[in-house]
Design a protein with these regions (language model features):
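N-terminal hydrophobic/helix-forming segments and targeting peptides
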Residues: 1-439
Length: 439
């Protein structure tokens, strides 16, 4: 039987095709849970025992819950990312090929598996900046129709397609919008969807998105497949854990950053000052002393959550033989000698202790020594605000496909681990010593 949390997560992913939609959905959940919204441009007046959140760029969000007894506080931080590899629609997007075809001009966002985007119905989603009453207002849009398709070349015209697959994003990956179409047809569709005049639209951040819904499958319903599992699965798990856990002596923080898939080097990315800015402003409200802020950070702990590679059933040779991770076998701790992951002996020990308390199994991932592997957000965030940190994720197949696969049980494992984490208090008590208190 599939846990209700898994069904809820799949609905969450289906309803949020872009980072902007994900952030808005998290915002709505927090508001319904009683969190108060803050603006970075306004003065903050925080109170012990209260819950808050703040957004940046409409695509990143940090939520936090203030403990009641903050004389010796620290931060419990968990982070994930809101974006996924896809195709961004360029300005001056329409390409008209006489009276026969109208295409959209796009460019790759992140490291997607191109072939998975072909020969399937697609649509358009993102945010649109609209002029309303003298202000520029951000509006979400997701055209709920089969609108586009990227056609592959028939094997009769490309006999090497199954042997030498190679895709030029400027040639092979441009989506077909229709036959002959009037100029500005995409803008007309979006204006109609938002019920605004075309000249009110001043800007946009629009992306291609798949139309296929998430599903549960397998002979025992043991697998889930969906777009954007990386990393909305971790966003959902952290958010649920934040809402379920509480620590009277700690400040629990959930940070969801945009632009991880393109390096995080934006104002709303993990490499920005967003996390530092929020933690420092919280600290200034607790006690306006930098000394107390630095003391708190020294005792703080962070989980950087970004999905991990499961052993591939057809290609197990891509996995380190002694560090095999499988779907439905629990949360993955990721380790890298070159520090692409933040995990070290201390942080892995803390993760192991918390997992044992939560009754959650842990697995360990390391790349083969002859493979470079990917990177994530934890080490970038740590360059701005440094604390003990461990990189984790949930095991999945086909990472960066437009339709990925994971285990049906693992989301619940992450929620339980995050609940335990957010129900704990950390304290540096001596040289090489970090106490992990049950709150």
């Amino acid at each position: 039987m599939i846990a209700s949390e898994v069904r809820e997560m799949l609905s969450f992913i289906d309803g949020n095709p872009t980072a902007y939609h994900t952030t808005a959905a998290v915002r709505d959940i927090l508001l319904k849970a009683g969190f108060a919204e803050l603006l970075e441009s306004r003065k903050w007046a925080l109170e012990p025992g209260k819950d808050y959140f703040v957004c940046r760029n409409g695509s990143s969000i940090i939520a936090f819950r203030m403990g009641d007894q903050l004389e010796n506080y620290s931060f419990n931080v968990a982070a994930a990312h809101t974006d996924s590899p896809c195709f961004r629609i360029k300005e001056n997007a329409e390409i008209h090929m006489g009276q026969n075809y109208t295409k959209l001009n796009t460019e790759g966002y992140g490291g997607m598996i191109c072939a998975t985007w072909m020969d399937r119905p697609l649509s358009v989603a993102g945010r649109v900046l609209v002029q309303e009453n003298g202000a520029i207002v951000s509006r979400l849009v997701a055209l709920d129709r089969d609108l586009l398709l990227i056609p592959s070349v028939a094997i009769h015209m490309n006999r090497e397609v199954n042997d030498k697959a190679s895709f030029n994003k400027q040639i092979d990956m441009l989506p077909l919008l229709g036959g002959a179409a009037e100029e500005g047809v995409l803008k007309k569709l979006i204006a109609a969807e938002l019920n605004v005049a075309e000249d009110q639209i001043l800007g946009s951040d629009l992306f291609l998105c798949i139309r296929e819904k998430a599903t549960v499958w397998g002979c025992n319903e043991e697998f889930i497949s969906s777009g954007r599992l990386d990393d909305q699965q971790c966003v959902f798990g952290i958010l649920k854990g934040l809402l379920q856990g509480r620590s009277v002596e700690s400040i629990n923080v959930a940070a969801f950053f945009d632009n991880e898939e393109v390096g995080s080097g934006t104002k709303q990315g993990a490499a920005s000052t967003f996390l530092y800015d929020v933690l420092h402003r919280i600290a200034q409200n607790v006690c306006p002393s930098d000394e107390d802020f630095h003391r708190a950070v020294a005792s703080s702990f962070m989980f950087s959550a970004d999905n991990a590679h499961a052993v591939h059933p057809n290609h197990p040779e891509h996995t380190d033989a002694n560090n095999c991770t499988y779907m439905n076998e629990g949360v993955v701790v990721k380790v890298h000698a070159g520090q692409k992951y933040t995990s070290d002996g201390m942080s892995m020990a803390v993760a192991k202790e918390l997992a044992a308390r939560a009754g959650v199994p842990l697995q360990y991932f390391a790349n083969r020594s002859d493979k470079a592997g990917g990177s994530t957000l934890g080490n970038l965030a740590m360059a701005q605000v440094s604390m003990n940190c461990v990189d984790i994720g949930l095991p999945q197949l086909a990472m960066h496909s437009c339709y990925e696969t994971a285990g049906a049980k693992d989301t619940v494992s992450l929620i339980r681990l995050m609940k335990e984490f957010y129900s704990s208090h950390f304290e540096e008590t001596g040289f090489g010593t970090l106490a992990v208190h049950k709150a």
